[in-house]
């Protein structure tokens, strides 16, 4: 992977925004670092759109959607979006959250009946994985999940690769999508994923088609569940700790930072702003 420095100075259309993963891309040891938080603010101050797309649950994401300088957080691998309160509500789309202090709205890609049906099926698969895969335990943030399930492999416990592969096989055998992030194994029913979530949020927020302006967006990530984004974004960047997942990636990021995690994201932001 070429270093990020090789991207500088190349001609490309003016950028309009940045999509970013959260865990181990914005965060370091589970928390966003001051330099990464300032990088988000600097990008927004420069007039760029900023959207975080994560496998984390919507419940976990709520305080960050309210507090971070981002336009939205798309959680649960593209299924749910959180943004500051909108002017309208509808049955499938936006629902005002009960905590008015945060003033957020939540939108879904799936209708309520489908979400309810899928949730029951996912809990059965989750129980099966915990029963059949030695050491497998649901992620500690599972209570905040509405449209997917997650098995912890590197956040508070460690699963060997064969156990990770076993859990993925069980999810896929049940008809679920399955991806592996830097900390969790995520599974869900539906056609959504990070890329579809990005397309969706661009339509929702700006009434534009992402595919028509893909060369004006940057994506920053760190693991195997980012590879669909690495594949489709011309300006895709891996923070340095993506090296851990390179043997498992079919599609690599176009560039890689020197810094890891939040420091790597801050490096990307500086490069973007230096080229404006």
What are these regions (language model features)?
Residues 68-71, 91-93, 156-157, 197, ...:
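Short, hinge-like loop/turn segments at secondary-structure boundaries
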Residues 8, 13, 33, 195-276:
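Mg2+-dependent phosphoryl-transfer enzymes with acidic/Ser/Thr/Gly-rich catalytic loops
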Residues 31-143:
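Active-site phosphate-binding/coordination module
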Residues 68-69, 77, 174, 232-233, ...:
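Short, structured coil segments at secondary-structure junctions
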Residues 20:
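Active-site T/S-Asp motif of two-component receiver
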Residues 124-232:
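Conserved acidic, metal-coordinating active-site core of Asp-based
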